[in-house]
């Protein structure tokens, strides 16, 4: 056992590796960074926001070697007791985080056609990490596993049965690690009993989703088989009538691939505003009177409020609504507009508390009294992954979850 063990958390995306190093005893972040632009001449590694290091034409293993070298420079290599990997999609095979074995890798590969862009990158990260740290126990944490508690009526689509039975077409949901972390923290902040409570978690960022959590379990969520379904997002359309897309294809001659690009990359806040997918840009334009920016934000808010209210139907009661993610944590305007839309649920906003910056951390923003408590809880997916790794790796756990 290392005297000062740490957990290395790795998140391999389609062209990047985000990583952090957390102290096992406290889960404090000791080091964090990103290797971006994999397999291009512009690839780089940035540690703790410092000057980027050139990694031209590096693949995942090259980038992880560079990260390992930076660990060694900081005398952290021998302290790596566990490695936690974020895996985008676990399909129906993975209902919880697991110790990585050859069999687990084979099963991840089996479900990877459900998320080819991300899962194969995740597998590349696992292969590289196992090669570089052969003696270190590694854990896989799935973005979909928290939602495996959905009932069939919540995850099935109204399609012919064979698409589900033969192809696995169903709602899987995403942002599960974030929803799980935030709901756990909400029980403490709101003084709720995990075994008898109802929460709605709104993870709002460039990607966004809603999750209904009943008695500690996900019972409904807005994203579907892919992250496209549900809320309108930065560049994703969210819910859209398939008939409308078929009509567009007929009228314009666009292919399925063309339309898939449109709804994933050219829609959402960007599509309606014609300006940007960045909410900060749109909020500035809102205050300057830019009509399409205002319309994009109002549509974004309407969809969020509608999904929150709809997801409440999956709960036995509604104790709290929690905002998280880059937008949920930082946008005073979006929280205000969403809560104003949800007056039907008995929500009342504390305007001054809502204006508090995210540096204030976890905070209740609903007025007293309010039928439903509204709060902001910064997400921490890296910590959740580290906690799972610590638990499964049987390393001395932190004193408390917080």
Swiss-Prot record:
Active site positions, chain numbering: 143
GO molecular function: acetate kinase activity; ATP binding; metal ion binding; propionate kinase activity
Site keyed Transition state stabilizer: positions: 175, 236
Gene Ontology BP term (one): L-threonine catabolic process to propionate
Pathway note: Amino-acid degradation; L-threonine degradation via propanoate pathway; propanoate from L-threonine: step 4/4
EC class name: transferase
Residues where ATP binds: 11, 18, 175, 203-207, 278-280, 326-330
A GO CC annotation given for this chain: cytosol
Pfam families on file: Acetate_kinase
Key words of the record: ATP-binding, Kinase, Magnesium, Metal-binding, Nucleotide-binding, Transferase
Calcium listed as a keyword: no
Enzyme nomenclature, EC number: 2.7.2.15
Protein name: Propionate kinase
Gene field: tdcD
